[in-house]
Structures are given as structure tokens and as C-alpha cells.
Amino acid sequence: METKQSIPLLMPYKMGPFNLSHRVVLAPLTRSRSYGNIPQPNAKLYYTQRTTPGGLLISESCVVSETSLGYPDLPGLWNRDQVEAWKPIVDAVHSKGGIFFCQIWHGGRVFHQDQPNGEAPVSSTDKPLMCKNMYGGQFKPPRRLRSDELPAIVNDFRIAARNAIEAGFDGVEVHGAHGYLIDQFLKDKVNDRSDQYGGSLENRCRFALEVIEAVVNEIGSDRVGIRLSPFADYMESGDSNPEALGLYLVQAMNKHGMESSTVTWLNLE
């Protein structure tokens, strides 16, 4: 009969500075229960029910700005009320011995509700999604971001990471996967730009690497994870050569001093 010590999932693991008692992780799960984009008190029960001593939890996606919501009633980390609302939730997870990372995210053209002031969602492209949104309707055509707008979005990720640490989280996971904004720059079946953020692998990866670098510089590499999905085509985000894309990203992070020994984890799907 197998013992706990012989089951890899149940064995301890050192993840950067964090000592995990096992390798079962709560994945980030969208809940759409944060009314007004503020996490509600019921989130404390939700997360503590899933906490074990030394276990790793990754929060539901937290949006980095009011123009990045994607889905309705998602929690944010761009203002003071949101930071304060997260604090008792994170404290409750820590009181049970959990290690809690916050996933920070921008939906880009995957936007299921109206933007502030009725503006179009933003993306690497102006190509609309052809699939249906969660309400059975059509996605609104996105507005192609100008290159001079991208530093502000990079800064939104940086501020969200800083706010996550202030709220008490142990670190953040940058969501660069599944057809959302960062992935919309990475994948050549979405990104049709001809500037320094499109075309070559180097150019298509530029925005992702700028985000990662800004977040690492803000909170430290041992508090940062990155989720990537070079092989997935969710939300019409396929790539013609996913192996080359994934390899380039890993090598580029290594070149920037962001290899697996400095970024807490790299989740490739």
C-alpha cells in the first residue's frame, strides 16, 4: 500500500522561498462574485475552505484596471477599497497556514460587458472574436492599441502587483495565457501588427516580457509566477509554431535573469 511519503503529490516541495507541505494547488477559478469589483466577505469562507497548512492557493483573476474586466463582477486591485477588502481574506488564509498568490490579469478583446464610457475593448489587433460571449451575443470589435499606450498597461500590472503585496498576498501570477491580452500579443493568429510589438517572435513577446520585468522589479522575482499557454487556442488565440513560441519565451526570461531559479514558477500549457 502506498504511503503518504511515496505519493509525489503529497510530498513537500520548496518553491522559491516558500515551503509547501504538498503539491496540490488551488488553481485560479473565476467566480464573478465581487460586486462592484470589490471582493466580498464570502470570499473569506470560500478560500479558507480550500486552505491546508503549507498549501498553495492562486486567487481568481484580479483585473489590473477598470478597462480590463473581461467578465462581470471580477475583483480588482487598482484602488484602495479593493486592497482593503482583500486584506481580511488573505489574513484568513494565512491563519490556516496557506500560501496565497494573486493572479493579475487583463482580458483585452475578451470583454463580456461594456467598457467605461462605452469605449471599445483594447487588444493587439482590431480583429473581433467570432465566437459567442457568455451571454450568447457577439463580442464587440476591439480597438488596436497604439504602441505609446502600452507602457501605461505595463504600469497597471506593476501597480496591481504592488497592491497585491500590500493586501498581504505572498506573490502574484501574471496571466499571460488563454487568449487574454498578453496572449493576444504573443500569438501570430491574433497579432497582426507591423510595429515593434508584432511580426517576429521577438516583437510579439516584447509586451509580455515588459510586463514580467516590471512586476519582478516591483515586488521581487521570488514572488512572481507566469502562466503561459503556447499550445492552446482558447479564444481564437492559436499560434503557427507554439513550440518555438514557448521556447523563445523561456529563453528570453532566462536572458533577462528571470529563469526558473528566479521566477517562482512558469506554468506552460
UniProtKB/Swiss-Prot annotation:
Residues forming the catalytic site: 180
One Pfam family cited in the UniProt record for this chain: Oxidored_FMN
Assigned keywords, A-Z: Flavoprotein, FMN, NADP, Oxidoreductase
Cofactor dependency: FMN
Keyword Aminoacyl-tRNA synthetase listed: no
EC category: oxidoreductase
Binding site for FMN: 28-30, 103, 227
Family of this protein: Belongs to the NADH:flavin oxidoreductase/NADH oxidase family.
Role played: Putative oxophytodienoate reductase that may be involved in the biosynthesis or metabolism of oxylipin signaling molecules.
Protein known as: Putative 12-oxophytodienoate reductase-like protein 2A
Organism: Arabidopsis thaliana
